[in-house]
A protein has these predicted regions:
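Short, surface-exposed loop/helix-turn segments at secondary-structure junctions
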Residues: 1, 54-67, 97-99, 117-127
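Hydrophobic alpha-helical membrane context
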Residues: 16-18, 50, 96, 118
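Non-heme Fe(II)-dependent double-stranded beta-helix
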Residues: 1-12, 48, 134
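Double-stranded beta-helix
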Residues: 27-92
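Conserved catalytic motifs of the protein kinase core domain
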Residues: 17, 32, 100
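Non-heme Fe(II)/2-oxoglutarate
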Residues: 86-179
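Short beta-turn/strand-loop junction motif enriched in small, turn-promoting residues
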Residues: 6-8, 23, 88-93
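Short, conserved beta-strand element in jelly-roll/cupin
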Residues: 4, 11-29, 74-77, 82, ...
Length: 179
C-alpha cells in the first residue's frame, strides 16, 4: 500500500474526518503493518495523480516528509487504530505468509459534507441521517479553508485502492507480481 492520504480520496467541506481501523489479525513488523507519519496531517494535501489520472498514491519524488519517522501500528487482532484523514500513511509488503486484515471506517463531524467520494451514494436525507452515530443532523455544512484536491479523473479501475495504485508510475514500496 503506497504512501497516501485518505483525504485525497474523499475531501469534505471541513477536515473533521477520521479513519478508524479494526485489526482483524495481529499487526506485526513481519506482516507489513500500517505506517503513520506523525504530524503529516498538518501539512499539505499531496498530489495522488499519475499519468493524468487519480491513482490513490503519492509519487515518491513528491513526498516532502521524512517517512523514516513513520510509526508502525503494532497490535493484536481486535485492536483499533485512529488517524486523521490527512495523515500520510502506507504499508510495506506482508512478508509473513499470515493474513493482515484491517476493516476501515470513515467517520466525520455531522457538518462535514463530502465534496467527492465519501459516504457512498445515498438516496435521501433520511438515509444520510441514519448514518449518524452521534450529534444532530444538519443540512448546513461547515465550510473551512482546508486544502482540497479532487480525485478526478477516476482511476481506470476504481474498485479498490490496490487497483487504483496499479496506475502509479513510481512506487516507494515493493510489489508482488501475481499471475
Amino acid at each position: 500500500m503506497e504512501w497516501h492520504q485518505d483525504w485525497a480520496f474523499y475531501p469534505y467541506t471541513n477536515d473533521d474526518v477520521l479513519a478508524v481501523g479494526v485489526m482483524l489479525d495481529d499487526f506485526t513488523l513481519d506482516n507489513g503493518p500500517l505506517l503513520l507519519v506523525p504530524g503529516s496531517h498538518k501539512g499539505p494535501v499531496l498530489d495522488h495523480h499519475s499519468d493524468g489520472r487519480f491513482s490513490g498514491g503519492i509519487d515518491p519524488r513528491s513526498l516532502h516528509v521524512d517517512v523514516s519517522t513513520a510509526v508502525p501500528v503494532l497490535a493484536p487482532a481486535g485492536s483499533i487504530s485512529v488517524h486523521h484523514a490527512r495523515t500520510i500513511h502506507g504499508s510495506d509488503l506482508n512478508r509473513s505468509g499470515q493474513p493482515r486484515g484491517l476493516l476501515l471506517y470513515e467517520i466525520c463531524a455531522a457538518d462535514a459534507w463530502p465534496l467527492a467520494g465519501g459516504y457512498g451514494p445515498f438516496s435521501d436525507l433520511e438515509e444520510f441521517n441514519a448514518r449518524m452515530i452521534c450529534g444532530e443532523p444538519t443540512i448546513e455544512p461547515r465550510l473551512e479553508r482546508v486544502p482540497v484536491r479532487m480525485p478526478q479523473p477516476r482511476p481506470l479501475d476504481p474498485t479498490s485502492i490496490y487497483n487504483a495504485q496499479k496506475g502509479l508510475e513510481r512506487r516507494f514500496f515493493a510489489v508482488l507480481d501475481k499471475p
